[in-house]
Amino acid sequence: MTAFQNAGPSITRLAPAKINLALHVTGRRDDGYHLLDMLVVFADHGDRIHIEKAGSDSFTVSGPFASGIPAGRGNLVLKARDALRQHGGPDLSPVAIHLEKNLPIASGIGGGSSDAAATLLALNTLWQLDLDFEMLAAIGLSLGADLPMCLHGAAHGTPLIARGIGEELNDVSGIAALPMLLVNDGTALATPDVFRALTRRENAPLPPPACEGTDALCAYLRETRNDLLPAAISLAPQIEPKLALLRAKGALYAQMSGSGATCFAIFSDESALTRAAKEIADENPGWFAVPSHSFPSRA
């Protein structure tokens, strides 16, 4: 990791991958935002944010996907820093922020939003602002519709149902830690492009969740959808064979996450997950093929 000007305490936080187990598009608001109904879990694999007090502000990036990250103020991490500083006042100390970028960019697993959420949480602690979750979520929502759910993921990690444009959050009980494989062949999809390609925007909401046990959860998921999948496939047809590959490797359930193009697969146990991950990585060098586990529901 890049060295910092060391002028005080430091904080490191995981910015977990956000996995949409199901995503139903139920309508569209007058302002253009789509109404969504989503079942979301968070993985133990993700980016990492390291922040410490410094003599001046700085931002550095490392990791396998660092090359695609903008270093200017258009970056969501810096937008989060500036938004929180605006709220807390001009006397807050300068900070050195380092992003370890382990997740593919524009891949449907919330990387940039999760990075911004982890930044808000870390700076809230480092600057001793003591803002509650609701205030941080309101600041996050001003930066992006999925910031509140990513803030929940970075703070708690527990599964949730997200509705509205993504800001209405409710915990979901009964979901165990899921052995999951995340796969992306390097395809990047811009979320606005996928939404523009939608042909149907009025769909049924999620059925009431039935999540007690992995088998029951996967049976439930087979009754759900990712309504963005047809639009994503129209832009990136290679998504479909990725899903077929995951099913052929023994997945209990496989689907695309978010607006794509990352796909995920749930496996029965650690052995099945490890075997599938190794086979796919060996057969497809250069792919992002990462075994992980989702965080479980609250006990």
Swiss-Prot record:
Enzyme kind, highest EC tier: transferase
Alphabetized SUPFAM superfamilies for the sequence: GHMP Kinase, C-terminal domain, Ribosomal protein S5 domain 2-like
Pathway(s) this gene product operates in, as recorded in its UniProt entry: Isoprenoid biosynthesis; isopentenyl diphosphate biosynthesis via DXP pathway; isopentenyl diphosphate from 1-deoxy-D-xylulose 5-phosphate: step 3/6
Gene Ontology MF term list: 4-(cytidine 5'-diphospho)-2-C-methyl-D-erythritol kinase activity; ATP binding
Enzyme Commission number(s) from the entry: 2.7.1.148
Chain sites annotated for binding ATP: P104, I105, A106, S107, G108, I109, G110, G111, G112, S113, S114
Swiss-Prot/TrEMBL catalytic activity: 4-CDP-2-C-methyl-D-erythritol + ATP = 4-CDP-2-C-methyl-D-erythritol 2-phosphate + ADP + H(+)
Domain of life, source organism: Bacteria
Keyword tags: ATP-binding, Isoprene biosynthesis, Kinase, Nucleotide-binding, Transferase
Pfam families: GHMP_kinases_C, GHMP_kinases_N
Active-site positions on this chain: K18, D146
GO BP, sorted A to Z: isopentenyl diphosphate biosynthetic process, methylerythritol 4-phosphate pathway; terpenoid biosynthetic process
Stated family: Belongs to the GHMP kinase family. IspE subfamily.
Role, per record: Catalyzes the phosphorylation of the position 2 hydroxy group of 4-diphosphocytidyl-2C-methyl-D-erythritol.
Protein name, entry field: 4-diphosphocytidyl-2-C-methyl-D-erythritol kinase
Name of the gene this protein is made from: ispE
